[in-house]
Amino acid sequence: MLTKQKFWINDMEAITCIMFILIVIGTINICSASLITAYTNFENPYFFLIRHLISLLIGFVAFALTSRFNYKKLKNCSLMLTVITILCLSAVLLVGVTVNGSRRWLSLGFMQFQPSEIAKIVTIIISASYLGQCIDKKIPITVNPQKNIIFLLCLIIAGFVEAQPDMGTALIIIGIPTIMYFIAGLSKKWIGIICGIGFILLTLLATFQPYRLDRINSWYDPWSRSQEDGYQIVQSILAIGSGGFSGMGLGHGFSKYSYLPESHTDFAFAVFCQEIGFMGAFIVFLLLIALAFYCIKIALRTKDNFGKMLVCGITLLIVGQATGNMAMVIGIVPVVGVPLPFISYGGTSLILNMISIGLVLSVDRHNHIIKKSTKNETITTPPIKYLSKKKHLYRLK
């Protein structure tokens, strides 16, 4: 009798394979997109590729260690991680490396390090720890600073990042915990208040910082400013459009020849579309969707609420960055400087993304261990139910 064969042995292997495929695609694209910029600035066409490979090696080691690490230990060191993150972000403002008017990096001699990337995952960890505890103990979820200092810490961290300035990353740092709070059961009233205050702050920032208002105007009508603020968006759209269905061929795109700024970082996807075409872009899109799908599967079956919320946050991080970057390069949203996970050049971003995936695997692995250890035991644990929907509404079940 024939037995049904599974394409994937398990979800962890599926996630690992998808991540490796995306990394291979990203490495090839970085090699092609960065050649001209690297040769022009450093007289070495493989300058960025070599640094990317070094980061990739560090990322592989970090991924392997993190996937075996017991994620539950993160709850005990969340305060330490928060303090280290704030100290690093403070150091950036004092002695950080300035590039294109933004001070976002710390120099380690042989490489540069971007603390705001760590801030993304740290805010997810501390938020997941608080939310998991609230769900376990059936405590009402709130963002009131008198009852919950965690959300305030996320705001402080986002404020440090915004001061660099880096609005795109700051929005991610505060946006993802907000969605996590909503998933865990924060009332719609609080969500509305957060969104309202956020809108007012964004309006004030755009009003008092003219370059941001110019960026919004250039996004609204980039073609009338094609030689000014709208130049980058126009060149990105032209690059994507010129790729057609099958692309110009790997290495044959012309936008990387100093036409498209940041062609190997924030706008690497535009170069990829030009050289590989719609077909390649669609494959990357499907891979990211598949990655999110398997992460959601793990979140749904995870019994530990801290692990569940941690996987939710990491999934939101990957999906949010991918959506923001793709929308940015085709002109749907203003330029916000958000990288495409595993595709855009960025050593710290790559390492932290691999660590994030390692944490997802850690959650699934350790919950499988618990499941196996209790397989032959009779457990009568009632499902989570809340008496008041206004206080508790655990939306992810």
Spans of features found by a protein language model:
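A juxtamembrane structural motif centered on a specific transmembrane helix
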Residues: 1-3, 326-397
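N-terminal membrane topogenic signal
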Residues: 2-19
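Hydrophobic alpha-helical transmembrane segments of multi-pass inner membrane proteins, especially
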Residues: 20-24, 29-32, 39-232, 270-328, ...
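Transmembrane-helix terminus/interface motifs of multi-pass secondary transporters
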Residues: 35-36, 263, 267, 319, ...
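Glycine/serine-rich anion-binding loops at beta->alpha junctions
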Residues: 110-119, 163-165, 244-249, 338-352
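Transmembrane helix boundary and interhelical junction motifs in multipass membrane proteins
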Residues: 166-171, 248-253, 263-265, 282, ...
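TM-adjacent membrane-interface loops and short helices in multi-pass inner/ER membrane proteins
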Residues: 218, 222-265, 269, 276-280
